[in-house]
Design a protein with these regions (language model features):
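Active-site nucleotide/adenylate-binding loops and adjacent lid/helix of ATP-dependent enzymes
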Residues: 2-8, 29, 79, 85-86, ...
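Short, charged/polar "capping" segments at the starts of alpha-helices
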Residues: 12-15, 39-40
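A short, Lys/Arg-enriched amphipathic alpha-helix followed by its capping loop at the start of a domain
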Residues: 14-29
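Short, surface-exposed alpha-helical segments at coil->helix boundaries
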Residues: 16-19, 76, 103-106
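Glycine-rich, highly charged phosphate/nucleotide-binding loops
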Residues: 35-55, 70-73
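Redox-cofactor binding/interface segments in oxidoreductases and associated redox assembly factors
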Residues: 60-61
């Protein structure tokens, strides 16, 4: 039996559907919010996640709420460290980073020759105007 963690800042109908279908496949399901995840970087311990994540086989990442840059990057770090710990991660940090950031998504599409709408990105509307990929 696999043990799967569903990690989300908001457990809604989608988390319930994922849980239902995982249980139908005979998986043990643990639902956690990001604020329930603890890291302990003690030099005497190899495992640094809290006990809820010690023995999971996979993680299904759902919803990351808004927050400060530090809060969001910490949540992404949790996800990166799960993968680095050899835990299969659905919706990996890399995937989230590539799809949530519209500038990065557009850039990846352009680099790979995939058409997308013309895009302009402003860093500071008063001082600087940067055209992203020359209007693609």
């Amino acid at each position: 039996m696999y043990s799967i963690a569903i990690i989300s800042d908001l457990h809604d109908w989608h988390s319930k559907e994922i849980e239902y279908h995982l249980k139908k496949k005979n998986c043990e399901v643990i639902k956690l919010s990001f604020n329930e995840i603890e890291l302990n970087f003690s030099k005497n311990k190899k495992i640094f996640f809290n006990k809820n994540l010690h023995h999971i086989d996979g993680a299904w990442v759902r919803f990351i709420n808004s927050g400060s840059l530090e809060e969001i990057t910490t949540k992404l770090t949790f996800i990166h460290l799960l993968k680095d710990s050899k835990v299969y991660t659905h919706n990996s940090a890399e995937t989230i980073e590539k799809t949530v950031d519209k500038v990065r998504t557009t850039g990846i599409l352009k680099i790979n020759g995939i058409d997308s709408p013309d895009t302009i990105v402003w860093i500071n509307k008063k001082d600087k105007k940067i055209k992203f990929n020359s209007l693609l």
